[in-house]
């Protein structure tokens, strides 16, 4: 599958690149960002996938989070896809910021008119890793995933739905229980229809209750002054309770004074890279 390089910038001895390709799952052209640390010049490196939140593209994380120095030091290839299909000309996809374009919610849609293109779950867990493994110096056996908000939800469900696939998972201010929050209800009813059992298959709090897999060490940072936490969009307490019940280790850090922004992410990104490096470089 042909990759078209859009940009390449040297950063902390490595290269931050952006590529475009024709996605089979999403039936459209997609961009993704990939950081190749200096270590990638001489051998295969672990792959760490970042999933962004609502309204984002592949650009937000690479320009705002300040992750490069840490990824360079730990020798991690970091991949950041877009958050939805683009340019599909589906009626209604650009009407609101929390549904459609920029809001794929990392599910495989089952409803018309979304089901042909809105297959971000399969894109992130299958198509993109295959593309990365085939075209970049990564070790396919060593991959982890993390994300923010909608992307934190995405990271948690990808790890919980695929035991053993990811070595570790972490999240910043994830949407932990989407079946119960306004964002989740809107997205899931649109993409997945009215059958709520289908919703639960993409809800981290429900998935953790039946998680059969290998031990997962989960790290979550949450800003205490996050407006969306206060608005009941994120519901981390429900997820923590489910993890505690299942004896799944989760480190949940409520960070005093921090909000939902990339300033919050930038503050704690090094901790998250270190968390993943511990497992990826073991």
Swiss-Prot record:
The modification N6-acetyllysine is found at residue 200. Gene3D superfamilies: alpha/beta hydrolase. Its EC number is 3.1.2.12, 3.1.1.56. InterPro entries: AB_hydrolase_fold (IPR029058), Esterase-like (IPR000801), S-formylglutathione_hydrol (IPR014186). The keyword DNA damage does not apply. Changing residue 54 to A: 83% of wild-type activity. The active site is at 149 (charge relay system), 226 (charge relay system), 260 (charge relay system). The modification N-acetylalanine is found at residue 2. Changing residue 190 to E: In allele ESD*2. It comes from the Eukaryota. NCBIfam families: fghA_ester_D. Homodimer. Serine hydrolase involved in the detoxification of formaldehyde. This is S-formylglutathione hydrolase.
């Amino acid at each position: 599958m042909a990759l078209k390089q859009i940009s390449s910038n040297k950063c902390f001895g490595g290269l931050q690149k952006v590529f475009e390709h024709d996605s089979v799952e999403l039936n459209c052209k997609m961009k993704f960002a990939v950081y190749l640390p200096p270590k990638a010049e001489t051998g295969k490196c672990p792959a760490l996938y970042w999933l962004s939140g609502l309204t984002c593209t592949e650009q937000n994380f690479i320009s705002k989070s300040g992750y490069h120095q840490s990824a360079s030091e730990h020798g991690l290839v970091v991949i950041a896809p877009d958050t939805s299909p683009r340019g599909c000309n589906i009626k209604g996809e650009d009407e609101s910021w929390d549904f459609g374009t920029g809001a794929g919610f990392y599910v495989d849609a089952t409803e018309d008119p979304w089901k042909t293109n809105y297959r971000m779950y399969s894109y992130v867990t299958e198509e993109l890793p295959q593309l990365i493994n085939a075209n970049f110096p990564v070790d396919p056996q060593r991959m982890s995933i993390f994300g923010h908000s909608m992307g934190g939800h995405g990271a948690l469900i990808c790890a919980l739905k695929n035991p053993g696939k990811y070595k570790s998972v972490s999240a910043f201010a994830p949407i932990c229980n989407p079946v119960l929050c306004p964002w989740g209800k809107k997205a899931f009813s649109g993409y997945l229809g009215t059958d709520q059992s289908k919703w639960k298959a993409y809800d981290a709090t429900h998935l953790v209750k039946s998680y059969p897999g290998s031990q997962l060490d989960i790290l979550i940072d949450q800003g205490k002054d996050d407006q969306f936490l206060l608005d009941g969009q994120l519901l981390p307490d429900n997820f923590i309770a489910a993890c505690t019940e299942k004896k799944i280790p989760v480190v949940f850090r409520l960070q005093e004074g921090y909000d939902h922004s990339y300033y919050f992410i930038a503050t704690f990104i090094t901790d998250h890279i270190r968390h993943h490096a511990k497992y990826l470089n073991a």
